[in-house]
């Protein structure tokens, strides 16, 4: 197969689309994380009123990342976004029936701060070791510096691929 044939095949094969919900409490760094994934400027972040959506290419996937506001008044509306979700980011939503068997990625964000709890401590506090109905990962990261963010997205792509097979 020549180079031209390979390029045509790659161009004709559409990226598999994956929907990711980015949920968390207000001021957790969700929007910063989203902008970091999209390689956008993170110097001016304001609280999300409603939601933001960005599409990011990664490992043959088109990742449609939904950043849903975390303020108390918005949280009751989170359920409206659950349909067709491929990856879940917030451990508190494990009990939701619509999300059963959906892989869970928990970003232990703000690891650039001296006061940040280590990922192992967060995993223990959330009793993640008791999760048996799905795969899960806790990923140390700093949305501000970008450290650990791509590692988390690599895990997402690997596990969505496994789930879709």
Swiss-Prot record:
Its main location: Golgi. SUPFAM superfamilies: P-loop containing nucleoside triphosphate hydrolases. A lipid is attached at residue 2 (N-myristoyl glycine). Coiled coil: none annotated. It holds the Pfam family Arf. Keywords: Cell cycle, Cell division, Cell projection, Cytoplasm, Cytoskeleton, Golgi apparatus, GTP-binding, Lipoprotein, Membrane, Myristate, Nucleotide-binding, Nucleus, Phosphoprotein, Protein transport, Transport. It is found in: Golgi apparatus membrane; Cytoplasm, Cytoskeleton, Spindle; Nucleus; Cytoplasm, Cytoskeleton, Microtubule organizing center, Centrosome. PROSITE patterns: ARF (PS51417). GO terms for cellular component: centrosome; cilium; cytoplasmic microtubule; Golgi apparatus; Golgi membrane; midbody; nucleus; photoreceptor connecting cilium. GO terms for molecular function: GDP binding; GTP binding; GTPase activity; microtubule binding. InterPro entries: ARL2/3 (IPR044612), P-loop_NTPase (IPR027417), Small_GTP-bd (IPR005225), Small_GTPase_ARF/SAR (IPR006689). One of its GO terms (biological process) is small GTPase-mediated signal transduction. It is a peripheral membrane protein. This is ADP-ribosylation factor-like protein 3. The lineage of its organism: Eukaryota, Metazoa, Chordata, Craniata, Vertebrata. The gene is ARL3.
């Amino acid at each position: 197969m020549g180079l031209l044939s390979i390029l045509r095949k790659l161009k004709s094969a559409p990226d598999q689309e994956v929907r990711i919900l980015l949920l968390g409490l207000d001021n957790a760094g969700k929007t910063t994380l989203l902008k970091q994934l999209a390689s956008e400027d993170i110097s001016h972040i304001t609280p999300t009123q409603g939601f933001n959506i960005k599409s990011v290419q990664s490992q043959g996937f088109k990742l449609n990342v939904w950043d849903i506001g975390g303020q108390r008044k918005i949280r009751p509306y989170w359920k409206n976004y659950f349909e067709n979700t491929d990856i879940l980011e917030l451990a508190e939503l494990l009990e939701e029936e619509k999300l059963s068997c959906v892989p869970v990625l928990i970003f232990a964000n703000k690891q650039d701060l001296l006061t940040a709890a280590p990922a192992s401590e967060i995993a223990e506090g959330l009793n993640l070791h008791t999760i048996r109905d799905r795969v899960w990962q806790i990923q140390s990261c700093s949305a501000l510096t970008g450290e650990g963010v791509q590692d988390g997205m690599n895990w997402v792509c690997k596990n969505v691929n496994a789930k879709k097979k």
